[in-house]
Amino acid sequence: MDKIIIKGARENNLKNIDLEIPKNKLVVITGVSGSGKSSLAFDTIFAEGKRRYFESLSSYARQFLGGNDKADVESIEGLSPTIAVDQKSTNQNPRSIVGTITEIYDYLRVLFARVGTPFCPNGHGQIKSQTPKQIADFLFSLSPKSKIQILAPIEIKKGYKINDVLNNLRNQGYLRVLVNNEVYQLDENLPQFLDNKKTDVAIIVDRLILNIDHQTKTRALDAIEFALNYSGGEIAFKVNDDIHYFTQNDVCQVCGFKIKEIEPTLFSFNSPIGACEQCKGLGYNYVPDERKMIPNPNLSINEGGLDYFKNTVNTTNLDWQRFNSIIKHYKIDKTKPLKELDRKEIDLLLYGSDEAIEIDITSANNKKYSSIDYVEGVLELVNRRYQETSSELAREHYNKYMSEKVCKSCKGKKLSSQALSVLINKINIIDFIEKNIDEAIDFLLHLDLNEAQTKIANPILKEVLDRLGFLKNVGLEYLTLARPASSLSGGEAQRIRLATQIGSKLTGILYVLDEPSIGLHQRDNDKLINTLKEMRDLGNTVIVVEHDEETMLAADYLIDIGPQAGVNGGYVIAAGTPQEVMQNPNSLTGQYLSKQKDILVPKTRRSGNGHKVILKGAKHNNLKNVDLTIPLGKFICVTGVSGSGKSSLILETLVKAIEYTNFNPFVIPGEYKDLIGASNVDKIVVVNQDAIGRTTRSNPATYVGVFDDIRTVFENTIEAKARGYSKSRFSFNIKGGRCERCWGDGTIRIEMHFLPDVYISCEECHGKRYNDETLQVKFKGKSIYDVLKMPIDEALVFFENYPGIHRKLQLLVDVGLGYLELGASSTSLSGGEAQRIKLAKFLQRKPTGKTLFVLDEPTTGLHIDDVAKLIKILDKIVDGGDTVLVIEHNLDLIKVADYIIDIGPEGGNKGGKIIATGTPEQLLSKKDISYTAQYLEKYLKKN
């Protein structure tokens, strides 16, 4: 069968649709936000494919895979095995890096274990082990008649007493030992050796005068074999007065630096064998931060300059009294601003006394106690409490004084010194993974290996280079293999999974992808489209939910779902080739693709309010000492290829620098020299795509504050007044009006212990969250539950006579969310929906003319028509006098900006510079160095 035939799909808002999708083609599903694209692609096609696969497994296997409900569809024919590559489930494990999730690091561990060469980290050259034959050859090369002692070195392990070790050797029957080059008879009284001093101990296995006769050789070889076995591969010869050390292990002959057996586990930072002992393989330690302890050095101790003691200074608090002993003993002035104290005094306050001092304590019943002891400083106190506490609440309190600091032992490289001493072509494994993908490919292609090493390395190199090539082909060449997985955007994580799938070379698979172009610059879009076509050409069906114009035009088959969102969507409006969809007068997507509809370029650009914020010398991550000027009162767009440094400059440095300067001294911005004009900003609003709440109790109505107003309306109904119900009666979070069986959740969680928890609708309230008495109170014939189930569009009309409610709902409609239910669970919302809800909340405030709005890729998940609505909202903010700063790749949004800041020219180490600034028209003069300018020119002409 060459088609997937879907009949009667009714999942979510789908309207009983019938659809035929050609197999082994690149199929794009598009439509306005909330129209039903994901309901068709993920909740119907993928869900049914997964369910059928699970049903083919044994009942024993299925019990570990959780519930897989049948999609609400009559039938699907021609379905292949399905794989979803979405933007969810980004790994938050701090130990996961790009190298581990792509499995490239596993191959590298084998490569370094088999081909790497150990070198002494103290500069003593290559570390070589010797074979027993080489050791014996050295012995027999000595001058005849030489006096030889064959020694088995003993390692005195930590915690063991030297005399106890020697007594144990005596009990084993040994006669003589060499201790610090002195011979001792074990059957005589031994001196008491100091355990805290470095002591070299060796058993004298044999003493002989070197001859070349057979008997002497045999005796010497037996002694060598015994010494090597006893000492774990170590041996020494005392020749006259000189000692010569040899080893079968990897040990430096000069300084004794020893390497464990070189196996792949030595290079794993998740294994105790390879991980740095101090940071346990994380590369950083969590330690108290002086900047957080002294957020305002203009304050004195009495004024709360030491933040931890600000509420207990000069009280009977025991911690304070003990700490105050330092202040008394060293006569530190508590009334002086901390910035006027000398460094020694600050160190005493932070790190404590380096001598025992007098401590005076007065108890609650006024008894006085004195003692003499060392006193810990405030940072040491916080660190100890943080490590010792088992209370999450206390840990959270101490947490605000802590920061991640690079591990001093491994310098952030995560591995032990033994692992880091193994090199290939002068670099260790961490040096290699800190290269970006392009640099890594170049390094591997130019490896200098001998014939034997090449034979071992070739199959490993093929696997690594293939995977690196796939990452490059999906536009991720700027990433390093050491990049933490938790720092990846949804789009980056998805494209990494995409690269992994290409590497599998599977055929006959149905892939379902969710907006793979997110976060991708237009320059890299062609690479992504070629990757999708490559997957198709392997004999797979590739279904992509996408809004990107280039991807839609590259599709073999385009499906437009609509016409609108929510209850007004769920229909197949058009299906066919992109050209056929463009010719369909009912298709909104077709109208935009054919340019019958368009987002118009403004005739004039705003000149701003004349004020600026200037950031100087930004060096965070890959930023190259950047000076940034933000003209206020404008719509500003920050552009640049993926990984060029946009987020590092704006979110990590500029935003945090303004927050640190104006609002929150606990925020730690990226490195910069100076910030000028921060006083021109009285509020900074970052609108990101994080969820609006962590539980099902959060919803759009509660987040924007309209639910309080709606509950007030119900409180004022005649029925509610007659029953004496207050506003709180209509809350599903408070006892009284809510259903007590499910505590207002509407669902009940059934714990399955070893299986995933199961959620069922509450039998008492039938999922309505409230008890019957509360639901009997009606407003215009609707209960509070009915109102929460309303789409926002419908609620807007329902509450048209209530200006406060109407205004808040109108803002949600304005940002394109009219299709959402008022009570939609926050956990069911996409990142783009969450971002627009936040925007609607902030738009309730009156413009101050000094607010800076910062949005990170706000067009994520938006159809072209929704982008047009978003632009109207952003224009409204700027027209009110405030400033909008957007990090964006979408050219429809970039072309309407007043001012563009383009960062590049490339990603990673080749980026980090501002290469062009100005209006879109001014940017075109830099198209020789700016990729954004090149595509913007085409786009402006096209539009």
Swiss-Prot record:
<keyword id="KW-0267">Excision nuclease</keyword>
<keyword id="KW-0228">DNA excision</keyword>
<keyword id="KW-0234">DNA repair</keyword>
<dbReference type="GO" id="GO:0003677">
    <property type="term" value="F:DNA binding"/>
</dbReference>
<keyword id="KW-0238">DNA-binding</keyword>
<dbReference type="GO" id="GO:0009381">
    <property type="term" value="F:excinuclease ABC activity"/>
</dbReference>
<dbReference type="InterPro" id="IPR004602">
    <property type="entry name" value="UvrA"/>
</dbReference>
<dbReference type="Pfam" id="PF17755">
    <property type="entry name" value="UvrA_DNA-bind"/>
</dbReference>
<feature type="domain" description="ABC transporter 2">
    <location>
        <begin position="608"/>
        <end position="937"/>
    </location>
</feature>
<dbReference type="InterPro" id="IPR017871">
    <property type="entry name" value="ABC_transporter-like_CS"/>
</dbReference>
<keyword id="KW-0479">Metal-binding</keyword>
<comment type="function">
    <text>The UvrABC repair system catalyzes the recognition and processing of DNA lesions. UvrA is an ATPase and a DNA-binding protein. A damage recognition complex composed of 2 UvrA and 2 UvrB subunits scans DNA for abnormalities. When the presence of a lesion has been verified by UvrB, the UvrA molecules dissociate.</text>
</comment>
<feature type="binding site">
    <location>
        <begin position="31"/>
        <end position="38"/>
    </location>
    <ligand>
        <name>ATP</name>
    </ligand>
</feature>
<dbReference type="GO" id="GO:0016887">
    <property type="term" value="F:ATP hydrolysis activity"/>
</dbReference>
<keyword id="KW-0227">DNA damage</keyword>
<comment type="subunit">
    <text>Forms a heterotetramer with UvrB during the search for lesions.</text>
</comment>
<keyword id="KW-0742">SOS response</keyword>
<dbReference type="InterPro" id="IPR013815">
    <property type="entry name" value="ATP_grasp_subdomain_1"/>
</dbReference>
<dbReference type="InterPro" id="IPR041552">
    <property type="entry name" value="UvrA_DNA-bd"/>
</dbReference>
<dbReference type="GO" id="GO:0006289">
    <property type="term" value="P:nucleotide-excision repair"/>
</dbReference>
<dbReference type="GO" id="GO:0009432">
    <property type="term" value="P:SOS response"/>
</dbReference>
<keyword id="KW-0862">Zinc</keyword>
<feature type="zinc finger region" description="C4-type">
    <location>
        <begin position="252"/>
        <end position="279"/>
    </location>
</feature>
<dbReference type="InterPro" id="IPR027417">
    <property type="entry name" value="P-loop_NTPase"/>
</dbReference>
<keyword id="KW-0963">Cytoplasm</keyword>
<keyword id="KW-0547">Nucleotide-binding</keyword>
<feature type="domain" description="ABC transporter 1">
    <location>
        <begin position="309"/>
        <end position="588"/>
    </location>
</feature>
<dbReference type="GO" id="GO:0005737">
    <property type="term" value="C:cytoplasm"/>
</dbReference>
<dbReference type="GO" id="GO:0005524">
    <property type="term" value="F:ATP binding"/>
</dbReference>
<keyword id="KW-0677">Repeat</keyword>
<dbReference type="GO" id="GO:0008270">
    <property type="term" value="F:zinc ion binding"/>
</dbReference>
<comment type="similarity">
    <text>Belongs to the ABC transporter superfamily. UvrA family.</text>
</comment>
<dbReference type="GO" id="GO:0009380">
    <property type="term" value="C:excinuclease repair complex"/>
</dbReference>
<feature type="binding site">
    <location>
        <begin position="640"/>
        <end position="647"/>
    </location>
    <ligand>
        <name>ATP</name>
    </ligand>
</feature>
<keyword id="KW-0067">ATP-binding</keyword>
<protein>
    <recommendedName>
        <fullName>UvrABC system protein A</fullName>
    </recommendedName>
</protein>
<dbReference type="InterPro" id="IPR041102">
    <property type="entry name" value="UvrA_inter"/>
</dbReference>
<feature type="zinc finger region" description="C4-type">
    <location>
        <begin position="739"/>
        <end position="765"/>
    </location>
</feature>
<dbReference type="Pfam" id="PF17760">
    <property type="entry name" value="UvrA_inter"/>
</dbReference>
<keyword id="KW-0863">Zinc-finger</keyword>
<dbReference type="InterPro" id="IPR003439">
    <property type="entry name" value="ABC_transporter-like_ATP-bd"/>
</dbReference>
